[in-house]
UniProtKB/Swiss-Prot annotation:
EC supergroup of this enzyme: ligase
Entry similarity comment: Belongs to the AIR synthase family.
GO BP annotation list: 'de novo' IMP biosynthetic process; adenine biosynthetic process
Name used for this protein in its record: Phosphoribosylformylglycinamidine cyclo-ligase
Organism: Listeria monocytogenes serotype 4a (strain HCC23)
Length: 349
């Protein structure tokens, strides 16, 4: 086939067609009740009536993966970064009590590599399966003048639904509520500009560096995918009146826990009430960071926090354990005097 004008401009249309064929099997495994239409339609569709909600409220979220992508590109490992993208979106809307319904992805790249694109979308589909969301659409944009041939960016968008009376807002959290923390897998998807600076600029480590405190090579630790909390937390929401949920992302405990509070409330976080993952101690040491800086930037081993009444603590923990989750009572809600987040106790190793 003769090279057309678009190809001469650096856009490989044929490679785009190959990507569509390669990803069909991954998209197919994310099908769920309510999803409509087929891959390749102009718009993704979802039948909201299939949920039989009386007063449905739609909750949307969008996010990317940040500079964690640079590690995936440098390591040439692209099959889990899509999980991160899904996690960052669905965990956010879960914080409002919403069940994720569908997801769309956007990949921008300098050169369309069908094998690489399939790996990325496979990760997105894996994340959608974990979240119970249908992958109903997406876009792969080849822009050779915007990106290098090996570079790409990844972003996602999700929509979920919740009954209006069950929508979780900041006004529901009360003084005396207990904070229950659910573990993270590691750094998740925030703070990677600092992470990369600490390890690869300041300390000049290599991707495959072996650090005694870690049980895997450094890059493997740093690319561990963000946990998706949808299924266990939705099970809790069926049985417990959860007053607040925080997705611990960029800004760590200090920035995120107050997002579920009104201005007259604060949280006391008991340090030492959960195991801090080794990677955080490693970063603290290599980056010469103090403990409070760590809690202002990273999740420190807790990726999601639920606020529940004291009477519901035992049942909440039971449901989480029944759904394969470790969970920890990490603090309580109190009246605010100065800071919105108060740390007490000491770090648990």
């Amino acid at each position: 086939m003769a090279e057309n004008a678009y190809s001469k401009a650096g856009v490989d249309v044929e490679a785009g067609y190959q990507v569509v064929e390669r990803i069909k099997k991954h998209v197919a495994r994310t099908e769920r009740l309510g999803a409509m239409g087929a891959l390749g339609s102009f718009g993704g569709m979802f039948d909201l009536s299939s949920l039989h909600l009386k007063e449905p409220v739609l909750v949307s979220g969008t996010d990317g993966v940040g500079t964690k992508l640079l590690l995936a590109i440098e390591a040439d490992k692209h099959d889990t970064i899509g999980i991160d993208c899904v996690a960052m979106c669905v965990n956010d809307i879960l914080a409002q009590g919403a069940e994720p319904l569908f997801f769309l992805d956007y990949i921008a790249t300098g050169k369309t590599d069908p094998v690489k694109m399939e790996q990325i979308v496979k990760g997105v589909a894996d994340g959608c399966e974990q979240a119970g969301a249908a992958l109903i659409g997406g876009e792969t944009a080849e822009m050779p003048d915007m990106y290098g041939s090996d570079d790409y960016d990844l972003a996602g968008f999700t929509v979920g639904a919740v009954e209006k009376q069950k929508l979780i807002t900041e006004g529901a959290v009360k003084e005396g509520d207990t904070l229950i923390g659910i573990p993270s897998s590691g750094i998740h998807s925030n703070g990677y500009s600092l992470v990369r600076k600490i390890f690869f600029k300041d300390n000049e480590l290599t991707l495959d560096a072996e650090i005694s405190e870690l049980d895997v090579p450094l890059v493997e630790e740093l690319l561990k995918p963000t946990r998706i909390y949808v299924k266990p937390v939705l099970e809790v929401l069926k049985e417990v009146d959860v007053h607040g949920i925080t997705h611990v992302t960029g800004g760590g405990f200090v920035e995120n826990l107050p997002r579920m509070l009104t201005n007259d409330l604060a949280v006391k976080v008991e340090l030492g009430s959960w195991p801090v993952l080794p990677i955080f101690d490693v970063m603290k040491k290599y980056g010469q960071l103090n403990e409070m800086e760590m809690y202002e930037i990273f999740n420190m081993g807790i990726g999601m926090v639920l606020a529940v009444a004291k009477a519901d603590v035992e049942r909440t923990l039971e449901v989480l354990v029944q759904n394969g989750e470790a969970a920890y009572v990490i603090g309580e809600v109190t009246t605010r005097e100065n800071d919105a987040v108060i740390f007490t106790g000491g770090t648990k190793g």
